Amino acid sequence: MDPSSPQHPSQDSPRPTQNLSAGSRASLSHRPASRKQSSDSTSNNKNAPIPDDEHGADMPLTMSASVVLTSLPRDAHQALADAEAVDKGKVTVRFQPLASAPILKNKVFKISASQKFETVVKFLRKKLDCKETDSVFCYVNSVFAPGLDEGVGGLWRCFKVDDQLIVSYSMTPAFG
């Protein structure tokens, strides 16, 4: 039978229903009956607020009174040691010319991992004998141009190819 027929009015139907007694109205699923408080304890606690936990402190602590660690956990020491070890070594950088950029005689160089990418760009400008007015555009893996303040060690760790940081360069913008 069609649910929108008068015998079975739909839930959203704007049609007036037939005169029904109060007992038959309570049995309709789309008409809420008057709400009674149930004696069931689960329904009484359903809308009750969650009580606050007592932590034993009457007044909030200031930042100067907060707990200070006297030593770091072992795993934190290892994580710090691993992070520092990345920036202590040397990184191999391979320069690749793009478009009509001049080709370097030696394309592979080593640089300290703690240096910023700015050092790589300055070194490349020096090798290419660029004037101060000349532009050099550098891209890692021919994909993106890193910021000058990026660490070479972090770039190498994330984007190395065959343990080398591939830096493509051009005298004109090569990519958007």
Curated annotation (Swiss-Prot):
Q: In this UniProt entry, which cysteines form S-S bonds?
A: none
Q: Where is this cross-link: Glycyl lysine isopeptide (Gly-Lys) (interchain with K-158 in atg5)?
A: 176
A single BP term in Gene Ontology: autophagosome assembly
- GO MF, one example: Atg8-family ligase activity
Pfam families from the xrefs? Answer: APG12
The annotated region (Disordered) lies at 1-59
Q: How does it sit in the membrane?
A: Peripheral membrane protein
User: Which locations, inside or outside the cell, does it occupy?
Assistant: Preautophagosomal structure membrane
Give start-end positions of Polar residues composition bias.
Answer: 15-27, 35-47
One GO cellular component term noted in the UniProt record for this chain = phagophore assembly site membrane
**Could you tell me which InterPro entries the record lists for this protein?**
Atg12, Ubiquitin-like_domsf
The Low complexity compositionally biased stretches are: 1-14
Instruction: List UniProt keywords, sorted A-Z.
Output: Autophagy, Isopeptide bond, Membrane, Protein transport, Transport, Ubl conjugation pathway
What is the role of the protein in this entry? Ubiquitin-like protein involved in cytoplasm to vacuole transport (Cvt), autophagy vesicles formation, mitophagy, and nucleophagy. Conjugation with atg5 through a ubiquitin-like conjugating system involving also atg7 as an E1-like activating enzyme and atg10 as an E2-like conjugating enzyme, is essential for its function. The atg12-atg5 conjugate functions as an E3-like enzyme which is required for lipidation of atg8 and atg8 association to the vesicle membranes.
The record describes its quaternary structure and partners as: Forms a conjugate with atg5.
PANTHER family per UniProt: AUTOPHAGY PROTEIN 12 (PTHR13385), UBIQUITIN-LIKE PROTEIN ATG12 (PTHR13385:SF0)
Family under the similarity heading: Belongs to the ATG12 family.
**What is the name listed in the Swiss-Prot or TrEMBL entry for this protein?**
Ubiquitin-like protein ATG12
Origin species, per record, is: Aspergillus oryzae (strain ATCC 42149 / RIB 40)
Q: What is the lineage of its organism?
A: Eukaryota, Fungi, Dikarya, Ascomycota, Pezizomycotina
